[in-house]
């Protein structure tokens, strides 16, 4: 690994992270709020960019595997730490609480440490939403689209930062792919903002919520989240944008080239829609028969939460802690499943579960017919044993980390149900905590040790374990080539 190459890439990323702070600065000036916390953070970003640039090399032609892993890991860690500064400089949060809020924003988790958002300046609320937007599609993807290419290693870094069921790209060149994905991301955000305004939000609230919806983050500028609006049409519009943000974004690029039928033919997205639809109907029936809500309202709340949980956005519209256990457990299943590969959603991803089920089915058939060869397919793509084994590995590592975080959180004083619920929601980057911690989670009241564990869990879930785990191997730090 060449440290100079890593420094060169990091210098550009630090510079980009500083530029993003212009938006909250403009917001602070518009509303007459303090802007120095953002300016100071911007200067720190630019200073680090300059230092990294001086340590780097003039140009980067290619990156090897270790350099890509180092760039991804250091980018997410360093930007998360840099974006602690506005919270601390504003005097509203301690460094630890600021770190949890920053990581929750960057990873799209959406659980907050703020007990009351009414005391938070609008510029800082917008900054929270912007951290969602930057981390949602991926720091590398966005900066590859906006800034000069990083070399052939861009493709490797994008694969490490966001997962998909296929390595195939919508466009032949990685720069074109990043630009197309970013354009879709931008259009969806703008469309959501306009629709939210039409259904009753103020322009600021609409922008803040759209910056959280499309990256499936969940930060809201209001304490009551979407529940502050007594509008079924608004809730269903939020549901719509959460669902389309849970699909593989490459599908939308392909649909532009080949027609809308590409989306309807995608196996993973069809299964995802089936899961959301079935969950919504089951929860609505349960809420209605239990006398919790009348059927029309039960349908609205059920589908809203099915979309919010499966997309791992985590918006709330009511207190689901009073729901029957059956409905709450469906939410647990959805938050662990997550959205589609290549989307902004978290969780295990639907394609992995499809392939796990198909692999088990093929294994059972192999037992019945030992001489036959069975292939595992999803759509038109055939998956080989090595790819399927990697999915099995990830599945068990994912569950293993949930149990590990749960164990560590119980050591800090949490009860088992609360620790397990918090572990699941942070690993899946959901923000909804299906336990006694509450319907609107306030992480600020948790012990310091629990906050640190939760922050680690968020990062591990967002980068899907293996990228950060690679840093723990001694061979990663040796000078031999990988």
Model-derived regions, located:
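Membrane-proximal intracellular helices of multi-pass ion channels
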Residues: 1-482
């Amino acid at each position: 690994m060449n440290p100079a190459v890593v420094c060169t890439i990091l210098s550009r990323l630090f510079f980009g992270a500083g530029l993003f702070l212009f938006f909250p600065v403009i917001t602070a000036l518009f509303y007459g709020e303090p802007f120095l916390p953002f300016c100071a953070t911007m200067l720190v970003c630019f200073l680090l960019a300059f230092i990294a640039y001086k340590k780097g090399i003039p140009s980067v032609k290619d990156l090897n595997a270790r350099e890509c892993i180092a760039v991804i890991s250091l980018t997410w860690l360093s930007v998360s730490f840099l974006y602690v500064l506005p919270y601390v400089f504003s005097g509203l949060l301690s460094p630890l609480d600021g770190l949890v809020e920053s990581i929750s924003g960057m990873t799209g988790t959406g659980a907050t440490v703020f007990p009351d958002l009414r005391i938070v300046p609008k510029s800082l609320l917008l900054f929270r939403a912007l951290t969602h937007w930057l981390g949602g599609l991926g720091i590398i993807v966005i900066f590859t689209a906006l800034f000069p290419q990083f070399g052939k290693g861009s493709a490797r870094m994008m694969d490490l930062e966001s997962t998909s069921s296929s390595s195939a790209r919508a466009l032949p060149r990685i720069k074109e792919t990043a630009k197309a994905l970013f354009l879709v991301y931008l259009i969806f955000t703008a469309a959501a903002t306009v629709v939210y305004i039409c259904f009753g939000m103020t322009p600021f609230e609409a922008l803040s919520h759209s910056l959280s919806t499309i990256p499936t983050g969940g930060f809201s500028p209001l304490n009551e989240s979407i529940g502050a609006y007594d509008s079924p049409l608004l809730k269903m519009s939020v549901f719509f944008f959460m669902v389309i943000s849970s699909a593989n974004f490459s599908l939308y690029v392909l649909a532009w080239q080949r027609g809308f039928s590409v989306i309807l033919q995608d196996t993973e997205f069809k299964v995802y829609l089936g899961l959301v639809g079935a969950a919504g109907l089951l929860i609505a029936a349960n809420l209605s028969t239990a006398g919790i809500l009348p059927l029309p309202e039960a349908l609205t709340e059920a589908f809203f939460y099915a979309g919010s949980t499966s997309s791992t956005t985590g918006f709330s519209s009511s207190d689901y802690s009073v729901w029957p256990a059956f409905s709450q457990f469906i939410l647990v299943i959805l938050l662990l499943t997550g959205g589609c590969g290549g989307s902004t959603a978290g969780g295990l991803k639907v394609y992995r579960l499809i392939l796990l089920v198909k692999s088990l089915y093929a294994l059972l058939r192999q037992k019945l017919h030992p001489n036959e060869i069975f292939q595992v397919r999803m759509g038109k793509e055939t998956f080989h044993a090595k790819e399927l084994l990697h999915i099995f590995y990830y599945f068990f590592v994912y569950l293993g980390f949930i149990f590990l975080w749960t164990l560590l959180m119980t050591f800090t004083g949490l009860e088992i149900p609360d620790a397990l619920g918090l572990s699941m929601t942070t690993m899946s980057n959901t923000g909804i905590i299906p336990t006694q911690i509450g319907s609107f989670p306030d992480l600020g009241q948790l012990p310091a040790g629990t906050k640190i564990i939760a922050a680690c869990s968020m990062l591990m879930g967002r980068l899907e374990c293996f990228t950060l785990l690679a840093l723990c191997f001694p061979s990663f730090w040796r000078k031999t080539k990988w």
